[in-house]
Regions:
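Short amphipathic alpha-helix used as the core "switch/output" element in two-component signaling
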Residues: 44, 66-77
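Interdomain helical linkers/hinges and coiled-coil/dimerization scaffolds
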Residues: 97, 103, 109-153
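Short hydrophobic/Thr-rich beta-strand motif most characteristic of the beta2 strand and flanking loop
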Residues: 27-37, 45, 93
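Receiver (REC) domain active-site loop signature in two-component systems and cognate sites
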Residues: 60
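Active-site residues of response regulator receiver
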Residues: 10, 57
């Protein structure tokens, strides 16, 4: 099965590299497909790369992580968002809950904690993928049944 695509967003290149190197992404069922150093660039990459997951910092220039999350929720409802930050502020956490963020983590990122988060997220993504597949199967079935009904004669002659 295909790996789920992840976009990393942080204005600190070292943070992106640390996250990229801390995990065995492939083993967890994910692949890092790109990174951006602010929310504006992240939106451009989201449009082009269509990630399943965006992992973003909050404090960044031009567009912060919460603004990015708002934009993603508006235009890309299927993308799951994980926020990490160095700021332990209640208002950020409250806004993250309001935006239905998948997970809110404090820096420095603990690889075990992020790994567990991604395992839970993979189960969610697998379930979503399975539901979409089931819907397609049902649509195919109902289309076939509808077609069959359309081709039957409306009047039987004896």
């Amino acid at each position: 099965m295909d790996k789920y695509k992840v976009l990393l967003v942080d204005d600190e290149e070292e943070a992106i590299e640390a996250i990229r190197l801390k995990l065995e992404w492939e083993t967890l069922g994910f692949e890092v497909i790109g990174s951006a150093n602010n929310g504006v660039k992240a939106l451009e990459l989201v449009e082009r790369l269509q990630p399943d997951v965006v992992i973003t910092d909050i404090k960044m220039p031009y567009m912060d992580g919460l603004e990015l999350a708002r934009a993603l929720n508006e235009d890309y409802q299927n993308i799951h968002i994980i926020i990490f930050t160095g700021f332990d502020e209640f208002e950020y956490a409250k806004e993250a809950v309001h935006l239905e963020i998948e997970e809110y983590m404090l820096k420095p990122i603990n690889s075990q904690e992020l790994s567990e988060c991604l395992k839970r997220l993979k189960k969610t993504l697998d379930n979503e993928r399975e539901e979409k597949l089931n819907v397609k199967k049902l649509e195919h079935y109902f289309n076939a049944v509808s077609y069959t009904h359309l081709t039957l004669p409306t009047k039987l002659e004896v």
